[in-house]
Amino acid sequence: DRIYEALEKFDPKKKIKKIIHLQGDLPNVSKKLIVSLADIIKNNKCIATPVVQADKNEILDENIVKCAASFKNPKPKIGEIGNALYFSRCPIPWGDSIKWHHLGIYGWDRSILEKYIKLKPSNLEMSEKLEQLRALEAGINIKILITNEKPIGIDTISDLKKFKKSINDY
């Protein structure tokens, strides 16, 4: 909702048709990942967002959003694009399958964003506290891009210390 409000102020004549929505708490997102999301929305009226394979410490962490997605390949590889089925703070899907850590970066087709902001928050969205569930419940396609990048999310003081260390190590 906030991204649309900013877009309306920045582009009231609606010339911009594709939007990349970056999060301030993910300061080290690569240009390559941004371009990859832009490529997906270039020819698709959808939302696009990346996932990376979750490590075992992240699977049970409720601060890490997981994504259940379908891919054509049963063992999808980096760069493959699939479709989101559900997002949760719980480990999904069940069993031994790969758990995907959702990175909170989005590519939007403007018409999809305009449709999205007219929707009321959904029951699942309010239950999980995940806004992307509103889109899924409304039948909006969310394309999932597998990446090997894992930008450092800064949600706690500990995360900030990790990020500062990564900059100093660079």
What are these regions (language model features)?
Residues 97-170:
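Conserved alpha/beta core of the MobA/IspD/sugar-nucleotide pyrophosphorylase nucleotidyltransferase superfamily
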Residues 29-122:
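Conserved core of the sugar-phosphate nucleotidyltransferase
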